[in-house]
Amino acid sequence: MIIRKKDFGIFALILALALGVTACGSKNVSNTSEGTTQYKYGKIDIPGKDGALCGAPIYIAYEKGFFAEEGFDVNLISADSETRKIGLNNGTIPIVNGDFQFFPSIEEGVKVKVVDGLHNGCIKFVVPKDSPIKTVEDFKGKKIAIDEVGGTPHQVASLWLEKAGISAKPQDGDVTFLPYSDGNLELEAAKSGEVDVAALWDPLGSIAEKSGDYRVVFDLSTDPAFAGKYCCFLYASSKVLDSEPEKISSLLSAYRKAQNWIAENPKEAVAIISDKKYSAIDDKELAEKLVVSYAYPTIKERESGGSHVAEDVKYFVTELKNIGYLKTDDPDAFANQIYQKVEVK
């Protein structure tokens, strides 16, 4: 191609603009001369293999490249609640999702802060369709299947029962919690009579209900004690937050991009989660309804002041104090201590 002199300036301008756009789009990611990719913050581990549908922002941030855009080479790992606490405390895991199960651990010295809200309710308690259990009062003396002691279903059940005057403490014997490694095993145990109730992450609870073989006796998204509140928060390692606050800010940016994308594209989000086998989804239409019910906050909602993270932290601190799960004498001060607002670009 021959470039005439009078066209050279235009050509140079177009080339400069193209290079500028490329540079702006990859400010946190670059390619080395060897052809490998370099990330601003390098490789990090994030728990994201528990199979819960509500973990959608983690899966979508990974699959849509939002983590990479913010400068992270993310390795999704499996991690129970204790592994998460240890990782957060020593800084090897910078951020995790979890409910108020971490509040007592913070009081006991685990160095972690609530930095954002992730979504609304995602847990259901189901019983066989012919079970006599219908209300919380019927739970006394019963066996409840959970995924792990100290995990979210266990903590939710504990708060719900304690508010009704039924002790969830093992030494009192009002109820018995039995851990199972898989939600399907919980359902089988409930069906066989090995346990009376299965406390399940979505989508298993809703799938069980739709089968007609089980009834839902508790829904975290609609129960008066939990409805409209974040059941799951994002927790940042205090060690990382203090030494590299911009790292946590960038991680939150990735999560928020994912939340916004899911809110605007629930059907596509479910397709990705199903195709990549992050969660067991046989009924995509049901899964889509559940994803919408989690009310992932959009960027516009955040900009208009729709966030209520601090208020929800204070609510659950107060509730946990009321049932004796927190020792603090000043719930408001403790709530302010464990929540830290992070500026996100």
Task: Describe the predicted segments one by one.
Residues 2-11:
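Bacterial N-terminal signal peptides that target proteins for export
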Residues 19-23:
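C-terminal motif of bacterial Sec signal peptides marking the signal peptidase cleavage site
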Residues 25-27:
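Bacterial signal peptide processing site
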Residues 31-182, 189, 196-202, 213-218:
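Short, glycine-/small- and polar/acidic-enriched structural segments
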Residues 48, 118-127, 214-241, 293-294, ...:
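Periplasmic-binding protein-like
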Residues 100-101, 182-277:
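Pocket-lining segment of extracytoplasmic ligand-binding domains
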Residues 242-325:
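Secondary-structure end/capping motifs
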Residues 313-345:
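Conserved C-terminal helix/tail region of periplasmic/extracytoplasmic solute-binding proteins
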